[in-house]
Amino acid sequence: MTTGRHTATELDPTLDDYQLASALVREAGQLALLMRMGGLEGERKTSVSDVVTAADHAAEAYVMEQLRRCRPEDGILGEEGASVSGTSGRTWVIDPVDGTYNFLHGSTYWCSAIALKHDDGTDAGQRTVDPSVVLGAIYQPELDKLWLGGQERAATLNGEPISGPSAASVAGICAATYIHPTWLADPRTAMPWHAAAVSAASLRMFGSGSCDLGRVADGELGCWFQHSCPEWDWLPGKAIVRAAGGETAVVQVNGMNWFVAGGPTAVRELSAALTSVPQFA
């Protein structure tokens, strides 16, 4: 496949799902990086920090094309609009560039991510908040880090086993998180976020949920929480954290879903902190 002057690899349909996921995020990430080196401009989506570039679209188009060749019976769901209904009961969920604001401004903290999920809880068009996920792959091109894991394969970083999330209490570890500044003006989100944030030893806010979750899985970051995550921001990392021996949860507070990942103790404590605040009618 050629996108402008950038050529990406045609993948082998005989690859197993884990091999295919790894190849897709690696190729998509390298394609995006090459396009950035050639110069890009961002287009605003919902806010000044929520942007999209031609690289996002090109990387998603590449992944979609390869999946339609290699897994024609599977569904596809992408952040930038890709949507294909499948017949297999499985759907690939694509985030071609997670952390586009970072990507556009020259940071290395961005990635390409993909998950394969079961199509459970989708009757009558109703999609479950936290579907069952088969596998996830996350690739951070500028650091050449590839996390992979799923139901049938323990989590790895660049092919090597990882130690898994911290078993410590939140009070003794750092918590990675993200919240847009405007949400801090709304007590429905500000109060639970604050309750969880102050329970941690330290906070990290880097701007790429999938990069964060890969680091929770390998123990570099202690735990993670964020609200209102779409599937492409949640499922790749969820699969890898669970494949590393960690836990994940989704809790609802004031009509908002909060997504939590880490070791069992941290997930339990963060969930309790988030739900400890007053409930608004």
Question: Where are the predicted features?
Answer:
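Short acidic/glycine-enriched loop/turn segments that link adjacent beta-strands
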Residues: 48, 143, 254-256
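N-terminal subdomain of lithium-sensitive/metallo-dependent phosphomonoesterases centered on the IMPase/IPPase/PAP
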Residues: 1-97
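DPxDG-like acidic metal-binding loop motif
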Residues: 86-153
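A short, compositionally biased
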Residues: 39, 149-153, 254-255
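Residue-level signal for inorganic ion chemistry
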Residues: 32, 56, 67, 100, ...
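An extended, acidic
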Residues: 163-281
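Acidic active-site catalytic centers that drive phospho-/nucleotidyl reactions
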Residues: 56, 79, 95-98, 102, ...
